[in-house]
Amino acid sequence: MNQIKQIPVIIITGFLGSGKTTLLSSILKKKENQKTAVIINEFGEIGLDHALIEHTDENIVELQSGCICCTIQGDLKKTLIDLFDKMMTGRISSFNRILIETTGLANPVPIIHTLMSSIDLIRIYSLDGVITIVDAVNGGKTIDLQEESIKQIALAEKIILSKTDIVDKDETKSLIYRIKEINPVAQIISISFGNIKNKE
């Protein structure tokens, strides 16, 4: 029996109001991201344009861009297996990567644990990394007040610093210093108006 080529999974976490939903919405609309499945909490929060919708199937929406948007039904393991089964039986278009959006200040550890501890999921999927979006305006305050934000930063391979265009450069440098104290190896990318501006 041929071994299934594992599908990479990227977890996207982010502080509340950091621009995570805006980023995901942008990903869904771009042709170059076709064959990407995005798992979100509810369709309403992503602001899907009905003109871009090809067809729907229960908790799954297929877009003209070739992306698949799916809401979590029950638990993550069930949702991931269901997505794969529907792809294999031709009920949805094929996808070659998955992005999972976490809610607000959710701890990404349970998602990582689910992906790495379930034999059923390990056969199909591989964890390809964690991306954390940090709001440059309120990032320092969030780190001070929310323990989960520290976990999000600590586990990330990439950290996207949003709203840097409306924050003083010294404030941004100070926040980057704090982020590097928590996670010295993550790549830090600044974003302005939704575009990648520079890398630290």
What is the predicted function of each stretch?
Residues 2-3, 151, 155-158, 167-200:
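C-terminal accessory "lid"/substrate-recognition subdomains
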Residues 8-18, 22-24, 56-57, 156-159, ...:
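Conserved N-terminal glycine/acidic-rich loop preference
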Residues 42, 101, 156, 162, ...:
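Residue-level signal for inorganic ion chemistry
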Residues 43, 164, 193:
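Short, ordered loop/turn segments at secondary-structure junctions
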Residues 110-117, 125, 136-149, 153, ...:
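Non-catalytic interfacial helical region
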Residues 2-11, 18, 22-142:
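Nucleotide-state-sensitive switch-loop elements of NTP-binding domains
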